[in-house]
């Protein structure tokens, strides 16, 4: 369940559209300046693992607030290199059902991270991310009517790389094929439940690959004061695949495993709007995903909205 908090988003979800066609603002057609930005995301997911020792199904309701500062590190005739620092805070709540009963997990996560992004003059980009997250979790059993753990500590981290190429089409239209690879790992402190069972961390890692294609439409105009405004709307289709074997925990010497359905598909729509010569901008995205192995059994939907101010 904590894995859902450590999964990294896309460049577009994080900061919206920083690279524009038309009259380029820089060698890379990318907004100059050092933006301060923030965004909030929320999602609801339901999971039926492909295999599970205990027949566990669970859902996850997540919200997360993220903020950051980006700075131009280098600019050449071929493109721009932008670095960033981020902080995040949020919660995730999960209701769990298995052959042994039902329960819930409530977790709070907070942490920080860093980003490094290359915007090429030819429309090519590469984005890298790293995040560290600390967790505080409460585990309860509805079947037993009591808490199993209170304030259990955990730690997770995520690493990711994304690359894409904007391909100009007729007029204001373009296509952006893109690929992303994200690794996440989560661990929690061992604890003993009220009945003396020792619960300890096994492995909880994921390596998710994403192939996506977005269709983009951009426009720009000048207001009465002569300042430029821009808009960008897009639709995106994604395929996801988890290359690893899921999670496992040890309960008093018994290994319990859960392996997710590995192949997923998703569709999304979103957009960005900037004004006052790109000093201010807002962006957002809505996204739905489902497992393609047992279509609809595992699914997720969510959205994010953000803003940035350039100084």
Q: Model-predicted segments: where are they?
A:
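Long, low-complexity repeat tracts used as extracellular stalks/passenger repeats
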Residues: 1-14, 18, 34-36
